[in-house]
UniProtKB/Swiss-Prot annotation:
The modification Phosphoserine is found at residue 498. Glycans are attached at residues 153, 172, 223, 354. The gene is Bace1. This is Beta-secretase 1. DXXLL motif is required for a proper endocytosis and retrograde transport to the trans-Golgi network, as well as for regulation of lysosomal degradation. The transmembrane domain is necessary for its activity. It determines its late Golgi localization and access to its substrate, APP. One of its GO terms (molecular function) is endopeptidase activity. Belongs to the peptidase A1 family.
């Protein structure tokens, strides 16, 4: 999750110019097509959207536009912790489950949580350690009173990890001092007995078990003042705000309640199917994660997708480093040729048997604008699709095109076109369906698990085999040592004789 400053090459027109950019990321911690009718077949639908329960949908004026951040550095919400309240900016992360805040001085923090100043802090006398792919943090667990000023008007007692040491976790200039993990208890650290913040919120206040995110990053101009270069968005706690999206909400089941795991059944580049076994798209999982910047794909899928994107955008040549996220490409301000880049379509399992829907992602999402480059006369971008060793991650650049509903009560995630997404006059982001898709359950990757009783049986058998081999070996060793002792006595005597000579 930490930034790694690098010297990057900027591609301008037909030449290459050196420039300094910022290689930013938020964290740290995928075979033939499906059988069945063609996915292009649209089915009739009686209604665009099923009715919502009272209180789950409506206007949440006080929560609209309560997120801030910077492109590539995450979205944060203002929270207060302790008594008297200490105000902190907290990164919104649907890919983890710990509520953790900086609790010691750090070069990248302007402020931090001071437990000794809170009369309501309770020490749990337990430590916690969280490693990421790049970076880590460790701290001490406790509980305190927490509220969200631009959220529901409630205060809850929640578990807090006070970060005392970290490495490559906090981001210089990001303006956030902690992380709010909104996923499930199964992936909480140190173990699943630690109740996550959102679980505590629902349990103590009876707020509906649902939240929704509108991330508007790409819609904010860059290469201007720091204030204007900020990104924004909304986190709606307890329901759905219909003013934040257009069209219909389409839902995909949450496959397993740990990360927000979903099932991708098909991937297209400009309408062309990658024609891979759908298990490859979900190897070893597919998750929706606001705490990761990029769309991350398993190795085979990434290679196939990049090959197709290269072919579709072949009217211009880009350095290999661009496709690896190591170099930027630049055009004169206002002349970015969006039309040469293809759209990416992800088909997600629907709620109805044998039906799926697709979300269409624009190049304005997967080409991430980068600020702080050598010249402000150019618009520069980083390729925000990258390779993953831990499955597909639908990160912030994907979510920025959509209003995403995390309906935990009904174990599903909804997608609709965001009212703030960036597009041109020719194409817009889209959520469409339904499509006929058979055997979608087969697309989910099942991590091999061995029954515990089987493991115990294997352990006993191995122990018995070891004992059978070790017994004669021990006897042989004992016999050898006895013989050696006898020889040793004779050898000592012989040596004495030699010395006497």
């Amino acid at each position: 999750m930490a930034p790694a400053l690098r010297w990057l090459l900027l591609w301008v027109g037909s030449g290459m110019l050196p420039a300094q950019g910022t290689h930013l990321g938020i964290r740290l911690p995928l075979r033939s097509g499906l059988a069945g009718p063609p996915l292009g077949l649209r089915l009739p639908r009686e209604t665009d959207e099923e009715p919502e329960e009272p209180g789950r949908r409506g206007s949440f004026v006080e929560m609209v536009d309560n997120l801030r951040g910077k492109s590539g550095q995450g979205y944060y919400v203002e929270m207060t912790v302790g008594s008297p309240p200490q105000t902190l900016n907290i990164l919104v992360d649907t890919g983890s489950s710990n509520f953790a805040v900086g609790a010691a001085p750090h070069p990248f923090l302007h402020r931090y949580y001071q437990r000794q100043l809170s009369s309501t802090y309770r020490d749990l006398r337990k430590s916690v350690y969280v490693p990421y792919t790049q970076g880590k943090w460790e701290g001490e667990l406790g509980t305190d009173l927490v509220s969200i000023p631009h959220g529901p008007n409630v205060t809850v007692r929640a578990n807090i990890a006070a970060i005392t040491e970290s490495d490559k976790f906090f981001i210089n200039g990001s303006n956030w001092e902690g992380i709010l993990g909104l996923a499930y208890a199964e992936i909480a650290r140190p173990d699943d007995s630690l109740e996550p913040f959102f679980d505590s919120l629902v349990k103590q206040t009876h707020i509906p078990n649902i939240f929704s995110l509108q991330l508007c990053g790409a819609g904010f101009p860059l290469n201007q003042t720091e204030a204007l270069a900020s990104v924004g968005g909304s986190m709606i706690i307890g329901g759905i705000d219909h003013s934040l999206y257009t069209g219909s909400l389409w839902y995909t089941p949450i496959r397993r309640e740990w990360y927000y795991e979903v099932i991708i059944v098909r991937v297209e580049i400009n309408g062309q199917d990658l024609k891979m076994d759908c298990k490859e798209y979900n190897y070893d999982k597919s998750i929706v994660d606001s705490g990761t910047t990029n769309l991350r794909l398993p190795k085979k899928v990434f290679e196939a997708a990049v090959k197709s994107i290269k072919a579709a955008s072949s009217t211009e040549k880009f350095p290999d480093g661009f496709w690896l996220g190591e170099q930027l490409v630049c055009w004169q301000a206002g002349t970015t040729p969006w039309n040469i880049f293809p759209v990416i379509s992800l088909y997600l399992m629907g709620e109805v048997t044998n039906q799926s829907f697709r979300i269409t992602i624009l190049p304005q999402q997967y080409l991430r604008p980068v600020e702080d480059v050598a010249t402000s006369q150019d618009d520069c971008y980083k390729f925000a699709v990258s390779q993953s060793s831990t499955g597909t991650v639908m990160g912030a650049v994907i979510m920025e095109g959509f209003y995403v509903v995390f309906d935990r009560a009904r174990k599903r995630i909804g997608f609709a076109v965001s009212a703030c997404h960036v597009h041109d006059e020719f194409r817009t982001a889209a959520v469409e369906g339904p499509f006929v898709t058979a055997d979608m359950e087969d697309c989910g990757y099942n991590i091999p698990q061995t029954d515990e009783s089987t493991l115990m049986t294997i352990a006993y058998v191995m122990a018995a085999i070891c004992a059978l081999f070790m017994l004669p070996l021990c006897l042989m060793v004992c016999q050898w040592r006895c013989l050696r002792c006898l020889r040793h006595q004779h050898d000592d005597f012989a040596d004495d004789i030699s010395l006497l000579k």
